[in-house]
Curated annotation (Swiss-Prot):
Keyword Magnesium: no
GO cellular component, one term: cytoplasm
InterPro entries given in the database record: AceGlu_kinase-like_sf, Asp/Glu/Uridylate_kinase, Uridylate_kinase, Uridylate_kinase_bac
Source organism (scientific name): Christiangramia forsetii (strain DSM 17595 / CGMCC 1.15422 / KT0803) (Gramella forsetii)
Entry binding sites for ATP: K9, L10, S11, G12, G52, R56, T159, Y165, D168
Pathway in which this enzyme or protein is active: Pyrimidine metabolism; CTP biosynthesis via de novo pathway; UDP from UMP (UMPK route): step 1/1
Protein name according to UniProt: Uridylate kinase
Originating gene: pyrH
Sorted UniProt keywords: ATP-binding, Cytoplasm, Kinase, Nucleotide-binding, Pyrimidine biosynthesis, Transferase
EC top class, as a word: transferase
Length: 235
């Protein structure tokens, strides 16, 4: 087993499947099966999920909404997604705990680092909702922060493309994929992996990031067990 403890970052949009908005139950079930395959191998799994399938604070601000208010709405969206994923995982017989960075005690535990680590040690999947609990920070930043706090070995960023390319492969067929790239080269080449705050935090704490296609069955297990899938970013 290559990694003992991973943090999986999923975007809210990933939960939409082929829909334009909201949550696709079939996609949720697929992701739950992928996560179960990793848990069954003894890997400790934490998850941070975005809220863009429901609401984005930045989008609200661009239409005149107060940015802080919008970000708070986005945080609540991540909790909704967390509850949906928790339900799907529990349907797959995986013990799961949802912790929130904002107090919402009726539906989620408050984020307590030691408690989160204890859940992981007991084989439970821990979903972190509510972002960082602060406006102006993305869920990418929340993912890196939580990964550092729980001492994860790696951040696995599940996307709809199979790694990092020289340019957007959905727009440029000539784009080529990197198997490995350094943090420094990502910055030099102006490649978009995460927002700058999240990426810098990961670099400073020497926390590797692997970007991979979450929608290809079996990929999560391959990445977690050390197979070369996607693009690895490290020092």
């Amino acid at each position: 087993m290559h990694y003992e403890r991973i943090l999986l970052k999923l975007s809210g949009e990933a939960l939409m499947g082929n829909r334009q908005y909201g949550i696709d139950p079939e996609r949720l079930a697929e992701y739950a099966a992928e996560i179960k395959s990793v848990v069954d191998k003894g890997v400790e799994v934490a998850i941070v999920i975005g809220g863009g399938n429901i609401f984005r604070g930045v989008a609200g601000a661009s239409r005149g909404m107060d940015r802080v208010q919008g970000d708070h709405m986005g945080m609540l969206a991540t909790v909704i997604n967390g509850l949906a994923l928790q339900s799907a995982l529990e349907d797959a017989n995986i013990q799961t705990r949802l912790q929130s960075a904002i107090k919402i005690n009726e539906v989620a535990e408050p984020f307590i680092r030691r408690k989160a680590i204890r859940h992981l040690e007991k084989g439970r999947v821990v979903i972190f909702g509510g972002g960082t609990g602060n406006p102006y920070f993305t869920t990418d930043s929340a993912a890196v922060l939580r990964a550092i706090e729980i001492k994860a070995d790696v951040i696995l960023k599940g996307t709809r493309v199979d790694g990092i390319y020289t340019s957007d492969p959905e727009k440029n067929k000539e784009a080529t994929k990197f198997d490995f790239i350094t943090f420094e080269d990502v910055i030099k080449k102006g490649l978009k992996v995460m927002d700058t705050t999240a990426f810098t935090l990961s670099q400073e704490n020497e926390l590797p990031i692997i970007v991979f296609d979450m929608n290809k069955p079996g990929n999560l297990l391959k990445v977690a067990t050390g197979e070369r899938v996607g693009t690895k970013v490290n020092l």
